[in-house]
Structures are given as C-alpha cells and as structure tokens.
Amino acid sequence: MPDYRRIAAELGRTPESTVFSIEDSDYDSGGWASFIAIRLACRGAEPEIRDGYQVTRYASVVICRIAPLAALMKVVEAGVALDGKGSFSKLPVADDLVSAVPWDTRQRIPEILANYGYQILAPEIGRLRLPDGLGVDTLLTSKDEKDCYIGHHVFDAWFHWMD
C-alpha cells in the first residue's frame, strides 16, 4: 500500500499548494471507503471567519485505494466551528470532477501523481453512468448476490466502493 502521507507531503511542497488535511474517508461507519482525500489549499490563502466558523477553500486530490487511479475535485469549502462544536465539508462526487486544480499553474499535481504510478481519471469518463444492474462482488455480499450500482457513475464505482 502506498504511503499517502509521502504523496501529500510532496503535493504540499509545490509552490502553489499547501496540504489542508488528509481524510481517510470512513464515512463515520467504522468501515473504510476506497479513497484517500488530500485536501489542498492555495498557498498564502487565509481561512475566512464566517457565521461562527473558520472556513477554508480547498481542492481535493482523491486517490483510489483499489486501483492506480486519482481524481481532481473542484474547489469547495470546509469549516470548523470556532467553539469546536461542529464542522462541515463536502464528500467528493462525480459532478465535482475537474481536469486541473486552478492554482496548479505549473501542472505539478499530475506529475507528482504519475511519479507514484497514478493516472488521473478524466472528468468526462468519471461522469459516465454505469449500466443499471451492473453487479460487483465485494466483501459485503454473499456469493449469490452482488452490490448493484443503479444510477451511479464510473467515479462512484472506483472511489465510493466500500471495502
């Protein structure tokens, strides 16, 4: 298994980005999803205080745990309550796929991911719908049943599969 912290550290050393957080994506369920989200903020950008929250704008580099695949997500916001009693963020979804992080003007992110053997999922591929009834064997199903991806996207199959 790759050392995601090393990838995050290298992404954070680019001139344009700093690592905001690394999320293991367990959906608060005790299980693990099949991705790691490395949240990148634009270097030099300050968090904003708004409505009792410290709000940070970030873009995610989402790394698949089950295949050498990564995805780039659009800029969104996460916040932590100033009193420490709450937070908010956004789960990566297919509609948020982008081909580049806006402040990565030198295109270092794809280069770093390629050095670790990851290919970036193109947004137009990630947004394709899977055929209804497509079944996938998982550890969560018996040998006679399959998890079905009804109405899901290619992105969902690679990055939201519960392992």
Locations of the language-model features?
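Extended, charge-biased low-complexity segments
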Residues: 1-126
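Acidic, proline/glycine-rich low-complexity IDRs
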Residues: 113-163
